[in-house]
Amino acid sequence: EIRLSLVGSEMCIRDSPYPAHLMRFKLPDDAACIMGHTRMTTQGDGKHNYNNHPFEGTAVIPFALAHNGVLYNDLTLRKDKNLPPTRIETDSYVAVQLLAQQGELSFRSIRSTVEPLRGTLTLSVLDSRDNLHIIKGNNPLTLYHFPRMGLFVYASTEQILKKGLKKGMPRMEQPFEVMIREGDILRIDRQGQYTVERFDTRNLWDGTAHFSWPYWDVYAVQNEYIDDLKSVAAAYGYTPHDIDVFLSYGLCPEEIEEIMCCGEV
């Protein structure tokens, strides 16, 4: 599933509960900041679009939030913090509710929102004033800056970011990486200036605790992924049988998609 948040003349979210590789986007000319999210379903059925990121919220001003990771104390926090009932099942949505409960969007309110969270996370929060907040927890994130273009681009890993830039903008200037540490809250404003403050990461999962999540079904997710690949195989010159052959060779669905789209792994 994929959703886009765009800030230009106004904030809007465009979304569909479909695999990202099936989506085609037409971006407004006045879009100044774009935040996208592709989701591997863990908690909350992705076929219900309200479960998919980025989520909308309001803390005096509208914002959109996306989360990379899994939280395992969301139900406890909803009860302890008296958060309003919601049909949204996704664990990440508790961060939206906590931030909205703060009544403002600031370093202080973001810090108060993320410090009680337990699990794995890196968050991005985009507000209607063109401010992008990146909250770096214990999940990866790579941020590039292209100074002459006044452009910031980020992705969960450097490998993904480089592949995306190679396909989308192959002749760009050489970027430099903006280094972000675990525990950083980085805000990039509409002028491209960035400010960093810190939050306490002690509640995040350290890899020693044992926990499990409801709705976690890796095999169901993988089977859906394979079905999606077979459904679009013909557009790339392959057949569903070819997908099965690749799988029999031991390739994972992600590697098969790379072969289909790029001709390489």
Model-derived regions: residue spans:
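Conserved short alpha-helical segments that host acidic/polar catalytic motifs at enzyme active sites
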Residues: 3, 8-10, 14-265
